[in-house]
């Protein structure tokens, strides 16, 4: 029997419902329970795949190829469960499925309404996503009071009636602000948020109160009194330097035990030693390395959320504080590579469109010519190949057909056919819809013997997640190999280039996939760990060069 924990948010958005849900999931998992997490998004887009990163932040790709909310990345980083397309759905997806059923005649000519048809579809999708788990944590996107969230809130209200309070539990995340002028913590926004939630039939069982500082006992008691929530169930969650401290903070306040008690679950004590080690390693680095992330969405760092977390994970596993310098590739086009001179390593992430491309190409050239560790992910690999073709293979005006359809040397072109990991041949062509038509999800990759990639992974076959429409053009790859480009990874059917490197460079790696999606704080990822180690080595080498003249003078 699956128990359901519904997490809602009030007062303001961006309080951290996703991280709170994931942290509770980590606690319950450490108590011996099988956990999964779902995210319900109230927007009308079918999925976030075609949404601007400036609007939505990162699109997280699951193993089965779904384009989902970035919160699913938090879920996978905190718990051991692998998310699928069933773990995230939107209002748009729900309505599309209901309308499809209506057109098919499934409702036998009935009038289709929000209640019961939309709410029934939401409940069915929640049950489907939760199937097989001891506990399903269901995060409802948006803020209580938003009109968009009402169908979801109504659906979970109905689930409480249908399943009872031994199988369902409501957690409400809310803000308790500190008003500096008055020198007081204000509980009124939380009181009103709970009042709004109760007005639609939901009484929270547990409150998680977000604040700048830990909540004093007096305010905790006041909140309990006015919201009809027992005082031990009012949890204080203040700001922390690292999100990986949150499972420990919530465990220490007894949240996991409180949940198990309310849901009548017999569970063991939560063993969070792994999280203690992560936090200790993050708080006590022995080294520092500066990494430039050269992209076009740098004004919103959530656009690269999994990427920044993967770099942090690599720092944890190398005892290194990773300083991330986000650099707009258009700024490099305007001001040149001077912006890169103080960094120890350069990373160019994925992206779409021609804006800022030449700045990224300049960054790859700067890294190649100056022996600086370079990590190109997805588009970052493609622009490294474009730069190499132009400079080393004398392919003037080489480009991707994404940016220049008439380029004389299309070293990167639309991928029209590939074999998925199930052995199925998938095809795409010009003019296809943008949504859901990319090469998506986990795909197997065969690594070249004696390559850097093979040494980093420690195995000859890996599965990594993809999200792209364009690939290296096999018709031109032979010429690039003659000039020193190493194809260190290929698709399992040998049709597609998955990884590249340069043999005469200290550390120059490109991959067509997105390794950041599978990095976790407890394990890291071999490519990111190798990249940070290379950055440290480059930093030490630079120090040695700078110290050499003064050493000679001393001699």
Curated annotation (Swiss-Prot):
Allosterically activated by GTP, when glutamine is the substrate; GTP has no effect on the reaction when ammonia is the substrate. The allosteric effector GTP functions by stabilizing the protein conformation that binds the tetrahedral intermediate(s) formed during glutamine hydrolysis. Inhibited by the product CTP, via allosteric rather than competitive inhibition. ATP binds at residues 14-19, 71. GO terms for cellular component: cytosol. Mg(2+) binds at residues 71, 139. The active site is at 378 (nucleophile), 514, 516. CTP binds at residues 13, 146-148, 186-191, 222. UTP binds at residues 13, 186-191, 222. InterPro entries: Class_I_gatase-like, CTP_synthase, CTP_synthase_N, GATASE, GATase1_CTP_Synthase, P-loop_NTPase. Catalyzes the ATP-dependent amination of UTP to CTP with either L-glutamine or ammonia as the source of nitrogen. Regulates intracellular CTP levels through interactions with the four ribonucleotide triphosphates. This is CTP synthase. The gene is pyrG.
């Amino acid at each position: 029997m699956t128990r359901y924990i519904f997490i809602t948010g009030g007062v303001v958005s961006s309080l951290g419902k996703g991280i709170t849900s994931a942290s509770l999931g980590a606690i319950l998992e450490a108590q011996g329970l099988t956990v999964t997490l779902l995210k319900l998004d109230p927007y009308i887009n079918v999925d976030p795949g075609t949404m601007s990163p400036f609007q939505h932040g990162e699109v997280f790709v699951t193993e089965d190829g779904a384009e989902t909310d970035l919160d699913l990345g938090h879920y996978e980083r905190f718990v051991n469960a692998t998310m699928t397309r069933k773990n995230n759905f939107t209002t748009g997806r729900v309505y599309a499925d209901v309308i499809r059923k209506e057109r098919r005649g499934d409702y036998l000519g009935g009038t289709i309404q929000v209640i019961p048809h939309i709410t029934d579809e939401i409940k069915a999708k929640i049950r489907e996503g939760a199937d097989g788990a001891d506990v399903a944590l269901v995060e409802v996107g948006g803020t209580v009071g938003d009109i968009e969230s009402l169908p979801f809130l109504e659906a979970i209200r109905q689930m409480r009636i249908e399943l009872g309070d031994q199988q369902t539990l409501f957690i409400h995340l809310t803000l308790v602000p500190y008003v500096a002028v008055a020198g007081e913590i204000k509980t009124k926004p939380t009181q009103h948020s709970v009042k709004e939630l109760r007005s639609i039939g939901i009484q929270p069982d547990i409150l998680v109160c977000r604040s700048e500082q830990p909540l004093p006992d007096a305010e905790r008691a006041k909140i309990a009194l006015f919201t009809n929530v027992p005082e031990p169930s009012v949890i204080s969650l203040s700001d922390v330097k690292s999100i990986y401290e949150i499972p420990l903070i919530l465990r220490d306040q007894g949240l996991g035990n409180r949940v198990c008690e309310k849901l009548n679950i017999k569970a063991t004590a939560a063993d969070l030693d792994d999280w203690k080690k992560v936090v200790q390693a993050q708080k006590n680095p022995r080294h520092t390395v500066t990494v430039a992330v050269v992209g076009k969405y740098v004004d919103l760092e959530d656009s690269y959320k999994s990427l920044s977390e993967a770099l942090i994970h690599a720092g944890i596993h190398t005892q290194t504080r990773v300083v991330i310098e986000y650099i707009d590739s258009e700024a490099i086009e305007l001001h040149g590579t001077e912006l890169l001179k103080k960094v120890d390593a350069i990373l160019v992430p994925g992206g779409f469109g021609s804006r800022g491309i030449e700045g990224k190409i300049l960054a790859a050239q700067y890294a190649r010519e100056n022996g600086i560790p370079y990590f190109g992910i997805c588009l970052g690999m493609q622009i490294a190949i474009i730069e190499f073709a132009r400079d080393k293979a004398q392919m003037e005006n080489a480009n991707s057909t994404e940016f220049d359809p008439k380029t004389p040397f299309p070293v990167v072109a639309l991928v029209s056919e590939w074999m998925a990991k199930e052995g199925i041949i998938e095809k795409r062509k010009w003019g296809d819809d943008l949504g859901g038509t990319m090469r998506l999800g986990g795909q197997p990759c065969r690594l070249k013997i004696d390559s850097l990639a093979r040494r980093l992974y420690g195995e000859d076959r890996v599965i990594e997640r993809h999200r792209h429409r364009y690939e290296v053009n096999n018709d031109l790859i032979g010429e690039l190999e003659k000039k020193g480009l190493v194809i260190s990874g290929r698709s399992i059917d040998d049709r597609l280039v998955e990884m590249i490197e340069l043999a005469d460079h200290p550390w120059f790696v490109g991959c067509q996939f997105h390794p950041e999606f599978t990095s976790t704080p407890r394990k890291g990822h071999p490519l990111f760990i190798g990249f940070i180690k290379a950055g440290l080595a480059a930093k030490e080498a630079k120090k040695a060069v700078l110290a050499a003249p003064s050493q000679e003078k001393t001699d």
